[in-house]
């Protein structure tokens, strides 16, 4: 009899616990849904504002680029153009952040490879000449 009582009480406790866990999960999922909806709204508003800002900046950058492209450029003008080009790339990277990071990585890698070639080219030439001289002396 005691065993039946213990089993019944254990079953009641387990079912009550399962119901409380299920209720907790439901309330958490409802909160998550509400938070996700509010985040979507915020992102939508932010996206609209960002698009408007990007369009204005792109227009300004194009006007400035046309102004500097038509006349003779000084070194200072050249720097301004470089900055404008960087701003345009940054604005484009806001649309496609993964592609922008890949382009930056690719550009960085190409710069590093060019530096290595500039350094290693003459060094390999000297090593090749030295080895050629050694082979001639040995042979």
Swiss-Prot record:
Isoleucine amide modifications at: 138
Gene Ontology annotations of biological process type: defense response to bacterium; defense response to fungus; killing of cells of another organism
Keywords: Amidation, Amphibian defense peptide, Antibiotic, Antimicrobial, Cleavage on pair of basic residues, Cytolysis, Fungicide, Hemolysis, Secreted, Signal
Signal peptide: 1-18
Subcellular location: Secreted
Modification sites for Asparagine amide: 70
Record flagged with keyword Nucleotidyltransferase: no
Tissue-by-tissue expression: Expressed by the skin glands.
Main localization, broad class: secreted
Described purpose of this protein according to its UniProt entry: Maximin-4 shows antibacterial activity against both Gram-positive and Gram-negative bacteria. It also shows antimicrobial activity against the fungus C.albicans, but not against A.flavus nor P.uticale. It has little hemolytic activity. It does not possess a significant cytotoxicity against tumor cell lines. It does not possess a significant anti-HIV activity.
Name of the molecule in the record: Maximins 4/H3 type 6
Species of origin: Bombina maxima (Giant fire-bellied toad)
């Amino acid at each position: 009899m005691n065993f039946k009582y213990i089993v019944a009480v254990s079953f009641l406790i387990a079912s009550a616990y399962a119901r409380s866990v299920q209720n907790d999960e439901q309330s958490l999922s409802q909160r998550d849904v509400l938070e996700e909806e509010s985040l979507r709204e915020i992102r939508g508003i932010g996206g609209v504002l960002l698009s408007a800002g990007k369009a204005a900046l792109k227009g300004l950058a194009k006007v400035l680029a046309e102004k500097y492209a038509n006349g003779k450029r000084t070194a200072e003008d050249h720097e301004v153009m470089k900055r404008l080009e960087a701003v345009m790339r940054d604005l484009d990277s806001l649309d496609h952040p993964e592609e922008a990071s890949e382009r930056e990585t690719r550009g960085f890698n190409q710069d590093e490879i060019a530096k290595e070639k500039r350094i290693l080219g003459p060094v390999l030439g000297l090593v090749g000449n030295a080895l050629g001289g050694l082979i001639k002396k040995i042979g």
